[in-house]
UniProtKB/Swiss-Prot annotation:
Descriptive protein name: Small ribosomal subunit protein uS3
Listed InterPro entries: KH_dom (IPR004087), KH_dom-like_a/b (IPR015946), KH_dom_type_2 (IPR004044), KH_sf_prok-type (IPR009019), Ribosomal_S3_C_sf (IPR036419), Ribosomal_uS3_bac-typ (IPR005704), Ribosomal_uS3_C (IPR001351), Ribosomal_uS3_CS (IPR018280)
HAMAP family named in the record: Ribosomal_uS3_B
SMART domains noted in UniProt: KH
Lineage, uppermost ranks: Bacteria, Pseudomonadati, Pseudomonadota, Alphaproteobacteria, Hyphomicrobiales
Length: 236
């Protein structure tokens, strides 16, 4: 099942959380959900070149807080903050509520699955060989600390008559292990031969903070190290 399902959705409530964080009555839920979709589509369309990874939407009472995670925050902010203020006003009109806009910089875009997928899609649109684009992304991710990465490219790759899927993997990507920190991203490349899809999985290690066994082991290690240091003092 882990091979088929979206790995982020599989880990919700385990080591991942939702990108829309709000509660609403049954009558308002549908409207706010569609509003979130419109906000995301608009922001992604406006900030195509800003390497946007994800958009988190929170809704305090009669307000809206939008957080954009980007590898190029300078492109969003603009000269003296002019661009970000223009974007904030537009989002306020869309939500009909007081909207605040936060920008969070991604310091390692080479291991962010969504940004990797967007980069490969842009290279495919520029007619870069898909194998070269995939291999370059894999090498960069492993060099920056990823423990494993898998990339799928599908469509009429290289202008072939018959569509196919090619994939490349380095390291390990444990999709069934819930405590594994697996990032997942997709993108589309609109080429002259049609649309090519790109999927990226990045394994960044295991998250053990939520594992009760891991916390017990850490506590035991602390007790063991403390008793060892006490014995050394007594012997001295």
């Amino acid at each position: 099942m882990g091979q088929k399902i979206n790995p982020i959705g599989l880990r919700l409530g385990v080591n991942r959380t939702w990108d829309s964080r709000w509660y609403a009555d049954s009558g308002e839920y549908g409207r706010l959900l569609h509003e979130d979709l419109k906000i995301r589509l608009y922001v992604l369309e406006e900030l195509k070149q800003a390497a946007v990874s994800k958009i988190v939407i929170e809704r305090p009472h009669k307000k809206c807080r939008v957080t954009i995670y980007s590898a190029r925050p300078g492109l969003i902010i603009g000269k003296k903050g002019a661009d970000i203020e223009k974007l904030r006003r537009k989002l306020s009109e869309m939500t009909n509520a007081e909207t605040s806009l936060n920008i969070v910089e991604i310091h390692k875009p080479e291991i962010d699955a969504t940004i990797i997928a967007q980069s490969i899609a842009q290279q495919l649109e520029r007619r870069v060989a898909f194998r070269r684009a995939m291999k370059r992304a894999v090498q960069s991710a492993l060099r920056l600390g990823a423990e494993g990465i898998r990339i799928n490219c599908s469509g009429r790759l290289g202008g072939a008559e018959i569509a196919r899927m090619e994939w490349y993997r380095e390291g390990r990507v444990p999709l069934h292990t819930l405590r594994s920190d697996v990032d997942y991203g997709t993108a589309e490349a609109k080429t002259a031969y049609g649309i090519c899809g790109v999927k990226v999985w990045v394994f960044k290690g295991e998250i053990l903070e939520y594992d009760p066994m891991a916390s017990e082991r850490r506590a035991a290690e602390v007790d063991h190290s403390g008793s060892s240091s006490n014995r050394r003092r007594e012997n001295a």
